[in-house]
Every structure is written in structure tokens, then in C-alpha cells.
Amino acid sequence: MPKFSFTPKVFHQPARVLFNSRIFELEVFTDFSTNDIKQVSLFYKTNTHSRFIEHPFKKNAKRFVFSYNPKEMPANYITYFFTVSLNNGAMYATPVDSSGFVTPVTKYLLDAAEYYKKRAELKN
């Protein structure tokens, strides 16, 4: 197997906390020219979906954002990753591990009131 070389061409910073009562955004940035990009996609699943759902983005100024409304699609957690395919056939993804394998992010959707109550208790 060829050795993986990490090239930071696709960037995503997971949010620290996601709430089950508020719309949140999953955003990815890419360092590729829009002329080189064939498709940018988010793949996500929740505890209510056993398979990943693909959300293809429209090309727009290197900013790709997906809004998730937990009130419309209730879930306990969301697992996701992003892919970028180029016109030359190359494929990139984020997040990946040191071997280049996709390592999806899993974030639990928390109750905001309970989260801030526990956080306040920790400060006291």
C-alpha cells in the first residue's frame, strides 16, 4: 500500500458542542480552485439512519455549509465526513487519520439547558 501523504487541501473544524434544540451548521473549506472541483459532498447519518446520506453542495466561493435542524430531524447524534472530487479524478476527504483513512466525526446532540447547568456546576 502506498504511503499516505497528508495534504491540507480540505479543512473542517468540528463544533465543540451541538444542541438538540438549535439549528447548527457543518462547514468545510477547500483550497482547490472552483474550476478544478467536480463535486463537494457531506456524508452524514444519525442514530435514526443506519446508512450515510449524501448531501452534494453547490459550488460557491470555496465555502460549503450544511444546516441541520434537529427539530425537523430529531437525533441523539450525528456522524459525518466530507469529500471533494476533482475533475482530474482525484478524491480528497476530511477528517482522515495518519494513514489516509476516513475517520468520520461523531457528535452527540445535547440538551442546551442540561449542558449549561452542568457547566455552571463545574465552575463552582
Predicted segments with their positions:
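Glycan-association/targeting regions that enable binding to alpha-glucans and other polysaccharides
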Residues: M1-N124
